[in-house]
């Protein structure tokens, strides 16, 4: 089976992390998040891949090239105007041809069992199959309501708690048939969740929802990004970490002062050059904190500075509310603490 990676995202909500790179190139434990997706596809036997690009396409093409170094064959299709998720995939029609194919986001982290998804699709032969994951905070996502046989009857887009009747969310991982793509107009902005899937249901086509075990995270905000990085380092997210080390969840923090508070000290033996992005500073081995740095965003500020006389960092988080400040400080301390154990 072939796969199309949706990799046109700019990542506006993720700024300043995406200040000088497209969202699929945001680093996750030493590799771009899209590289982890390619490795996931390869583990499940998918090596014929096309990336649908729009924002800063040359950055992505220059990094991955033909895909040979990752053991895959990688092609690219570039949108000249915004086409939406389904429209961007339609732009790859010459790639997928007359075969069913898998669609996956290039800027979400996951270790879902794609082989199970493919097997269910082949067994049931729906117009489209959607990977569903349980989400404890489903308000930011589209929910899928399934019948007893697993076929989707309706969707609820970003509901409030009064309308949350399931915690199964649409992961944006699909297996699509060519007959479904016939409903997508060419060179027109068209979305899978908002346009194509409702239209398929209206026409009486079958949409299969497959609940999937494993990890899935939409890296859409700095908070979710930090949480995803921590999950990767702790082993909750099963990915290949750069450098050859394995994640091992600690029983407790190595520094007793490293706890959830607005001001926390956290040990770190990271040494190299000063980075201007929080993603690089925490995730690239050898970042230099000797001068410290400050990250400012909409309603929050994170300051990281060395403590004189010892190999520790002071992490100070300020935000418009205490809860956000706690979350920022906690995530930053967890990442630094995990890095310390691997760099010591």
Regions found by a protein language model. Name each.
Residues 233-249:
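Oxyanion-binding "anion nests"
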Residues 2-5, 13, 27-105, 109, ...:
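Conserved N-terminal catalytic core of the sugar/cofactor nucleotidyltransferase
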Residues 246, 251-344:
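Phosphate-binding and adjacent anionic-ligand microenvironments
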Residues 100-102, 109, 115-122, 136-138, ...:
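Catalytic-core segments of class I nucleotidyltransferases/pyrophosphorylases
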Residues 8, 54, 133-134:
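Histidine-centered beta-alpha loop that forms part of the nucleotide-sugar donor binding/catalytic region
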Residues 25, 144-146, 197, 209, ...:
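A structural signal for short hydrophobic beta-strand segments in well-ordered beta-sheet cores
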Residues 85, 216-224, 307-311:
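Glycine-rich phosphate/pyrophosphate-binding beta-alpha loops
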Residues 124-134:
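A short, conserved acidic/glycine-rich loop-to-beta-strand motif
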């Amino acid at each position: 089976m072939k796969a199309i990676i949706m990799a046109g995202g700019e990542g506006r909500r993720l700024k300043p992390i995406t200040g000088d790179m497209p969202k699929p190139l945001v680093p996750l434990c030493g590799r771009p998040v899209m590289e982890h997706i390619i490795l996931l596809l390869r583990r499940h036997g998918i090596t014929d891949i096309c990336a649908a690009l729009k924002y800063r396409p040359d950055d992505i093409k220059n990094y991955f090239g033909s895909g040979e170094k990752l053991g895959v064959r990688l092609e690219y299709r570039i949108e000249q105007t915004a086409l939406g998720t389904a429209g961007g995939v339609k732009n790859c029609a010459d790639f997928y041809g007359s075969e069913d194919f898998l669609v996956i986001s290039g800027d979400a982290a996951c270790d879902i069992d794609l082989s199970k998804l493919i097997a269910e699709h082949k067994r049931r032969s729906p117009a489209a199959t959607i990977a569903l994951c349980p989400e404890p905070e489903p308000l930011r996502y589209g929910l899928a309501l399934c019948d007893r046989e697993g076929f989707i009857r309706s969707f609820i887009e970003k509901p409030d708690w009064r309308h949350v009747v399931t915690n199964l969310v649409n992961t944006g991982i699909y297996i699509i048939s060519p007959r479904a793509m016939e409903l997508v107009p060419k060179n027109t902005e068209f979305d899978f969740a908002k346009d194509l899937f409702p239209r398929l249901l209206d026409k009486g086509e079958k949409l299969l929802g497959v609940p999937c075990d494993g990890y899935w995270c939409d890296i859409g905000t700095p908070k979710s990004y930090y949480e995803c990085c921590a999950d990767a380092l702790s082993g909750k997210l099963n990915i290949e970490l750069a450098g050859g080390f394995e994640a091992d969840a600690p029983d407790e923090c190595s520094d007793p002062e490293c706890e959830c508070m607005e001001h926390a000290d956290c040990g770190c033996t990271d040494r190299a050059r000063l980075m201007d992005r929080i993603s690089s500073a925490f995730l690239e081995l050898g970042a230099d904190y000797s001068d410290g740095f400050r990250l400012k965003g909409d309603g929050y500020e994170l300051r990281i500075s060395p403590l004189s006389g010892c190999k520790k960092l002071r992490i100070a988080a300020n935000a418009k509310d205490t809860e956000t400040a706690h979350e920022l400080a906690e995530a930053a301390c967890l990442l630094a603490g995990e890095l310390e154990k691997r760099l010591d």
